[in-house]
Amino acid sequence: GKHNNWSLSAPGYGSLLNPGSSPQENAIFLTLLCATIKAVDEHADLLRASVAKSGNEHRLGAHEAPPAIISIFLGDLLDEIIEQIEKGGTKKACTQKTINIGVDTLPMFPLDASDRNRTSPFAFTGNKFEFRAVGSSQTCAWPMTVLNTIVAESLDEICTILEPVKDKPRFHATLNKLLQNIIKKHKRILFSGDGYGEAWIEEAERRKLPNVPGTIEALAALETPKAKALFEKYKVVSPVELHARHEIQTEIFHKEISIEAETALL
């Protein structure tokens, strides 16, 4: 499989997913972070559909690949910040932990906050997200198109609320309340545990997160009215083009599975 590194940048700002030394005070970073959380939660089915391939039907959930359940890993530092925002604001500074390797002549090293067990399909790794469910034989163009589109929708909705607010103090108050509401509504998508365990399958069901291991069932997300409206609104693909993509991917899956079955019988 592939690990697709994704982030956004802007002239004069650099990477918008760079938390800086005080991420709890970085409004741009927190806004994009929450927008991404919102997007992935609302469109987890589309992200899953974007990597629906015959090879992934065997790979996901095993072979050091993430499970078919889409979730987000943030790491301890961001988990703490998100929890504080949900409670009404960052009341204390959140600092990155360090490692003392026991050698006086060497400096303390920052503890890596990224996910190393590889069981999270969508993980924050320092200054970017990694989408880890794309198949090895698959182009990453369509998964990244889906991710860009769903985050664009999320940012569009956030900006629609914030842009009319011209007073600076009221703007920050509105932003803080908006981020708090986003976290409260979409925190179910956040998961830092073992994605391979049976307990996660049960927990995901309790959270009402989609668990779609089958390719055909996953591709059905492309045919929903929600998906057609999303891609048409942002002029990515038309409903007809989206339907064609569903038909083509379904046909490819059937052919690949048939070839595998016929080869096994030789």
List each language-model region with its residue ranges.
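Beta-rich nucleic-acid/ligand-interaction surfaces
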Residues: 1-9, 55-62
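Acidic/histidine-rich catalytic neighborhood
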Residues: 2-31, 35, 71-72
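Acidic, glycine-enriched catalytic cores built around paired aspartates
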Residues: 23, 28, 39-266
